[in-house]
């Protein structure tokens, strides 16, 4: 599954009768552009999508590397994108990014926000119209 891309790590996100994979390239500590694929099942067929990140520094995953997709308990198709910001010269000063995953035409995307709360998921649009 997507092995030819030499991904750093892969995070599965099941949503609305589909599954998405969030990943990035193997660049060590350096952030890079996020990649995303989706399929009707884990077995494919897989479709590659453009970089799912939007906003400032989206071309380098907001300065981080994806680490996990956290489902929001009690909310359908609600997920938090989690990423680490590593600082090689100061490893004890690692930072973290948590952003809500949003959907457009049934495809997940991650938009930079300076701040947000879990109330965001009470106002969001559904992952697809066939729920």
Label every model-predicted segment.
Residues 1-131:
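Carbohydrate-active catalytic/glycan-binding domains of CAZyme proteins
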